[in-house]
Structures are given as structure tokens and as C-alpha cells.
């Protein structure tokens, strides 16, 4: 590698196999690599069962793993404490959304407000040319000089959904070395590099709710016994009572605690009225949605476009028509009705493999 091609690159290291391989690959290519882990949460508040570890990223054990990998491959390593910022920018938003009757996606918020904002700023302070992460997504620069955000090549691991808020300025300073690889290929590289984390399991839970008990977490943050009220159907008939609207999400069937001759699902949550609205499976279907805080990776030249959209991470993209509205809003009409359109989740728009942009689901449309 020529000195001109050699770059100083900060790698966001979580202690997992993906970010570890990212760092090792860039070091092998001849770049000047600096590893950084983010301390975002006080894990002393939780204790895993004896002999077990939580399936999260960013715990103290994970930071220790990242430090050992950095030592192994011979790169400097730092820990930045973003606990205060993470509480304000991610956790408070997470709690607020649940108490508004919505179901948030904190991983998108973390990418948007912490990883590709605060950590990217820290990388620039260190004189880095680029920030690298282990995300399974790709960035390509077009002939027009603009950066295009694309799906990762591994369809089972593609994480482009979580990255829709990235701007042109951010994409110019970010790299995703694993975007063209599959997970098995990444593990093979980890083995070739001799990394201790080669067989480390996947992080499954939200990092600040390591036991996956959302209700306990929310009540620890805001107190129990709030937003208690009625379970009703669409007509307003009272079918039962609940212990807090934040315990429910659209599509939920279990835990309703009401007897009914037919299966009932949560079809809406009205925190203002303290009501959980239930109905048969058919009432989960919606012809479209309205999204707010919509952003575009590349500015649109039209007010209406045909695209495919995902309304949750594991959702298969479906054809839709997007109409841009005033105030960074958009109306999304599906070609066929979709199930469980959930306020608070992200809707992300695609054209083939390319991420066009996305926003936050504000409401499901009810008319045909």
C-alpha cells in the first residue's frame, strides 16, 4: 500500500466478531487503525445468571474482549464514555416512546445520534480519515460524486435498515468493510486471524435491556402503576383492564388476560386515553401509513415515487407508493395491505439494493 492510499481509520469495536474482523482486515491492508469502544450503559445494574453472559454488545465484558483483540492485532485502543449522552439521546427517547403508546427502535437512534454523530466526531478529533464499523451494508460512490447506501451482500445479516438516517457528509467519512461478505466468511477470517472472539455468539438483546424485560426496565425508569386503563375493541366496548399501556405493542396476542371466543390481537395503543385496543387478526391489516421525520440519503427530484419498503427489521420489502408531504412527512401506500404497522418503528425505502431513505411510522392508514 502506498503512503497516499494508507489511511488513519477509527474502528468502532464492540468486542464481537464483526468489529474485530473489521479492525484486523484494515490493519492487514496496511492502514493505521485505532480501536474505540463506547461505554454507554452501567451494567452493574444487572446481573446475569451464574455462569452465563447477557447476549448484548457494549457490556464491560465486551469492552474487555475488544481490548484484548486490539492488543492481539497490535493497534491502540481507547474507551469513550458516552453514558450521559446515551441516556439523553437514546434511553430517554426509548422510554418516552413507550409511554406515548409507541414501540421504538433504539438501534436506529443509537446509530443516528451516537455512533455516527458523537463517535464520528471523536474519530475526526483523532485525525482519522474514516470511521469503520462491522455493519453488513455497503457504500458506493456514483459517477455523480454522491454516496449510495446499499444492502449488505448477506441477505440474512443485512443491516442497511438501521442506517437510513446517514447523510452524504457521514457516508463520505464511513466505511463498512464487511458489506460484501457473509457471516460464515467473516467467522472464517476471524479464525484465520486467530481472534479469540472467532466463535463468540451474536448479540441478541438491546444493550441496555440485557435481560429483555422491557416492562421492568420501563418501570425502573418511570415507576410502576402508570397508564393503567381499559382494554377495548374498535367500537369502544370494554373487554377488560390492563396494568399499563406501555406493556403492549401492535400485533401482540399474549398477555391480554381477557376471555373471548376468538383470538384477539392488539391493533392499537392510545396512551392519552389509557386504552389498549384489540380486535381480530384482520384488523391488523392496513393499506398504508404516515411517516414523520423522513430523511433521504440522496435528495429526491420528485414528490411521488414507487419503491419497496420495510416496516420492521425482519420485514420482507414490499412494493409501495411514497408521496412526500410538507414538514418532512410522507404517506406510504402499500400495493397490498400489510400486517402490524407499528407506530414508533422505522419505515425504510429501497430501490433494488439501494436505500433511498426512511422515517418513523406515526400512524397506520385506516381507509382503503
Curated annotation (Swiss-Prot):
It comes from the Bacteria. Disulfide bonds join 110-207. Pfam families: tRNA_Me_trans, tRNA_Me_trans_C, tRNA_Me_trans_M. Its EC number is 2.8.1.13. It is an enzyme of class 2 (transferase). Keywords: ATP-binding, Cytoplasm, Disulfide bond, Nucleotide-binding, RNA-binding, Transferase, tRNA processing, tRNA-binding. It catalyses: S-sulfanyl-L-cysteinyl-[protein] + uridine(34) in tRNA + AH2 + ATP = 2-thiouridine(34) in tRNA + L-cysteinyl-[protein] + A + AMP + diphosphate + H(+). The keyword Secreted does not apply. GO terms for molecular function: ATP binding; tRNA binding; tRNA-uridine 2-sulfurtransferase activity. The keyword rRNA-binding does not apply. ATP binds at residues 12-19, 38, 134. It is found in: Cytoplasm. Residues 157-159, 312-313 are annotated as: Interaction with tRNA. One of its GO terms (cellular component) is cytoplasm. The record marks 135, 345 as: Interaction with tRNA. The active site is at 110 (nucleophile), 207 (cysteine persulfide intermediate). One of its GO terms (biological process) is tRNA wobble position uridine thiolation. Belongs to the MnmA/TRMU family. NCBIfam families: PRK00143.1, trmU. Catalyzes the 2-thiolation of uridine at the wobble position (U34) of tRNA, leading to the formation of s(2)U34. This is tRNA-specific 2-thiouridylase MnmA. The lineage of its organism: Bacteria, Pseudomonadati, Thermodesulfobacteriota, Desulfuromonadia, Geobacterales.
